[in-house]
Amino acid sequence: MLFRSQSYALFPHLNVWDNVAFGLKRDGVPKAEMVERVEDMLALVQLQKFAKRSPHQLSGGQQQRVALARSLVKRPQLLMLDEPLGALDKKLREETQVELVNIIKQVGVTCVMVTHDQDEAMTMADRIAVMSEGRFLQVGAPSEVYEYPNCRFVADFVGNVNLLDGELTEDEPDHAVITSPLCRFHVGHGISGHLGMPVTVALRPEKISLSLQDPGQSHNAVACRVESLSYFGSYTSYHLKTLHGQTLQAWVTNTDRHHEHIEMGQSLWAHWQSNAMVVLDR
């Protein structure tokens, strides 16, 4: 196994080629094989024309690729990366994420990456493990962990979520009804629980739709007032307050420049589909 920490730890007195070759030289790899492996790795990370440059002459993203090449050229069975992109700015980090995944997949090495950046984990991982107090709480594909969290902690830890408490009042194979002071939740599947069981409904902000008109549904809808809003370009985040004092967060994608204009203090309806929720034990 090879471990690469947050620091690139490139040797400042060695050029790119010699940095990548360093481990092979120490292992006594024959020169012809070493040259071939280093050249192949520099081609893979697209740094052939920078082979004679010193580390200080490279950008942060290029230094990151040199450090990765130095690790991969030794052909480890397992590579562990600790916050590998933490030193890069946001835009470069996003660009490098895709490059890094492609390089690792081409080499065919198993990679374990430690990160506190959830966007980074979602983008790069085939499987994500959520840990708390030394225990694995859920392991699965990024979409599985995000869309179907198996407990309240995972739902709250991964991404943004509205956690709403209620009581199971109807449970059939094709649907369930959860009653709360907020509204009646109609879930599009059974949950195999006993009636009266306290549960928590997990509802992601992007699953909520907003309307200035009553949507005319007896469930999965609640009257709200806009407490605050934040414009992020591609979407707008709304903090809503219900008549019962419950706070909801909703994200609305700005697909149309001429969509309904919603302002602070305005009254509206929040509503969502029956398949938008995940029911968790409380």
Regions found by a protein language model. Give the residues of each.
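Short, small-residue-biased leader/transition segments that mark boundaries at the very start
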Residues: M1-L2
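ABC ATPase nucleotide-binding domains
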Residues: S5-D156
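Short linear sequence elements within intrinsically disordered, low-complexity coil regions
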Residues: L10-V16, D27, C151, N162, ...
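Non-catalytic connector elements of ABC transporters
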Residues: V161, E170-R282
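Short beta-strand-centered aromatic/proline hotspots
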Residues: G166
